[in-house]
């Protein structure tokens, strides 16, 4: 009698099992199935589309009996949940960056259901090797279809071969180190600084450029110190006489008076131009008012003449 068509036969007779011919390789000799205690042993059935090499041992599938439609439905639902969690688009997707020590894939636990058949009828877990250097297929009673895993035991669907190394392998970089790695920019020195101060600042920047990048606060301090040093050196080298001081003061007063007279002249010219503009505008408004009065008188005469 032909056994019933269940989820196991559906997964093994599918496109994946017929397109790729898997070889079955077991690390140990297959143990004979234990006969069930309460149910008669079912006849072993071999998938017609499953191809095995001549050197491989035959793998007989035991179809559990007394499986209800609810059991098959729960099995399909759990398979769909596993595929959905293994998808990279799901939020539960994990991408390991280090190899796992386990050589077997541990499937997700299924909801607790009352057993409808004897678990002793299940076959022991077998491993199917497609190629020793590539990956092997793990057969599990919970996941009836073969799951491709690599040599480290990680499923191929949940592994990222191009994943970066763990974050702990990178040295932490602070914000200050990131600022120091930036390229130094050209500093703009004001034009009103004396030539000696500019030269000193440039020499200091050239000497410090190979060591570290100077901050704005350090540059300001350097400019202030250089200006003070230049003023002290100028005062020590040249001691002014009273006549020179009086002459310098007169020159400063003359320059200040010239600036004052210039500002007064500009203010007077601005006021005169503004007054001229206002006067011209006033004349224009008066002419406009007179024209409007003449137009009103003409309209009055025209209206009175018609009456």
UniProtKB/Swiss-Prot annotation:
Positions of the bZIP domain: 243-304
Chain intervals for the UniProt region annotation (Leucine-zipper): 278-285
Keyword annotations: Coiled coil, DNA-binding, Nucleus, Transcription, Transcription regulation
GO molecular function: DNA-binding transcription activator activity, RNA polymerase II-specific; RNA polymerase II transcription regulatory region sequence-specific DNA binding
PROSITE patterns on file: BZIP, BZIP_BASIC
The keyword Ubl conjugation belongs to this UniProt entry's keyword annotation: no
Bias type Pro residues, positions: 30-43
Composition-biased stretches (Basic and acidic residues): 266-286
InterPro entries xrefs: bZIP (IPR004827), bZIP_sf (IPR046347)
Region named Disordered: 24-51, 259-286
Role according to the record: Transcription factor which negatively modulates activation of the mitochondrial unfolded protein response (mtUPR). Plays a role in response to infection by the Gram-negative bacterium P.aeruginosa.
Name of this chain's protein: Transcription factor zip-3
Organism: Caenorhabditis elegans
Organism classification: Eukaryota, Metazoa, Ecdysozoa, Nematoda, Chromadorea
